[in-house]
Amino acid sequence: MNYMGYDAMTLGNHEFNWGIPTMQTILGQASFPVLAANVTDAQGEPVTGAGWTIVERGGVKLAVIGVVTPDVPIWDSGKDGIDDAVYEAANVAVGKAIDEIGDQADVIMVSAHMGMYAEFDEEGGSDSAQKILDDNPEIDVLQVAHNHVVVNEKQGSTVIGGVRNGGRDIARFDLTLDADNQIIDSSVEIVDM
């Protein structure tokens, strides 16, 4: 990923499989920020060091907020550091990140390692990308993962994309901005690899 020039990465649930210290050691080799706004240590700091980042291209500032399913302890409880971390509802963590970002960005993108709909928390939706969007409608781009299904839709002005596992396809998001960096058109395309 360093070789490919990644701008950022969002944690997935499998990064936690060997415990948080091992994950942090491995991810420490990344030359880009690894994002997890909703998983913090006892001091309230993201376990990866960052919850969001701003990427600037061609004068456009894109805020990327990363969240992972807060269900990690269901699968990995008992592994080193897992039970010491705090797993916040993704919709709440995204809202806090958007508040922190304020007017620093022209475009808000959320990279959510979770499906559109709740996997375990059907009442609260803490693990639902749809709940993130419902509570934070100012999101411009929502990238989803975890369920390994294709998602290609638009809700309001938000484009949403998700792809299958194994690198079989990628989601391409196209945004058209005016001279003031306001989005005037957006689309998502799922591209077979």
Where are these regions (language model features)?
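Acidic, metal/ion-coordinating pockets
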Residues: 1-193
